[in-house]
């Protein structure tokens, strides 16, 4: 089960043109924003990654503006784990639970999740904050991740799991985000 002390939120490739062409893009972007804001309220570190940003673009303003102090971690590999800067950022934070959101579910998110699972991390893919250009690609990636030992969650499920109860100091502001 997700815990605040062990979780890192990683926003994978919510960037440039890609963010606008995936299925149900506006809903996914909105959910990513809620998740990023919730992670901030809970004190959960968040990493922004961008694959080939010089070609595809950087993290979209709707998300980047929520973390103005944070720059994209650019990479060429599909998997975030295969990039030394991302790997070092994750290792420096010394946490074992990876909460993943972004695009595309069947390429960069899938390969990242598989590599993280192989390295012994617990991987939670936030289903309402991920997408692909085709929903069939997304559903296949989710099924494969689940079969390989990953976990599926939603924005609301993850945030409320992290808080544990209504006495958490972030309960009211997170409840307001969700509504």
Which residues does each predicted region cover?
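Short, flexible loop segments at the rims of nucleotide/cofactor-binding pockets, characterized by
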Residues: 23-25, 50-51, 75-78
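A cross-domain feature marking catalytic cores of carbohydrate-active enzymes
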Residues: 14, 48-51, 127
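Short acidic, Gly/Ser-rich segments with clustered Asp/Glu that frequently serve as metal-coordination loops
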Residues: 16-20
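A short alpha/beta connector and helix-capping loop motif
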Residues: 4-7, 22-48
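Active-site-adjacent betaalpha module
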Residues: 1-8, 41-42, 54-179
């Amino acid at each position: 089960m997700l815990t605040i002390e062990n979780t890192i939120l990683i926003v994978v490739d919510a960037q440039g043109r890609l963010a606008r062409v995936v299925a149900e893009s506006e809903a996914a972007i909105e959910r990513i924003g809620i998740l990023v804001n919730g992670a901030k309220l809970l004190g959960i570190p968040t990493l922004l990654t961008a694959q080939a940003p010089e070609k595809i673009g950087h993290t979209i303003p709707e998300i980047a503006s929520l973390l103005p102090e944070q720059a994209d971690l650019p990479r060429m590999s599909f998997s975030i784990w295969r990039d030394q800067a991302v790997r070092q950022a994750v290792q420096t934070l010394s946490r074992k639970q990876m909460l993943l959101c972004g695009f595309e579910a069947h390429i960069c998110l899938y390969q990242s999740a598989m590599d993280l699972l192989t390295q012994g991390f617990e991987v939670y893919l936030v289903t309402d904050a991920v997408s692909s250009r085709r929903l069939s690609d997304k559903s296949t990636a989710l099924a494969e991740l689940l079969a390989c030992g990953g976990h599926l969650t939603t924005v609301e499920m993850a945030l409320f799991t992290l808080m544990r109860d209504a006495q958490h100091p972030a309960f009211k502001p997170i409840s307001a985000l969700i509504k």
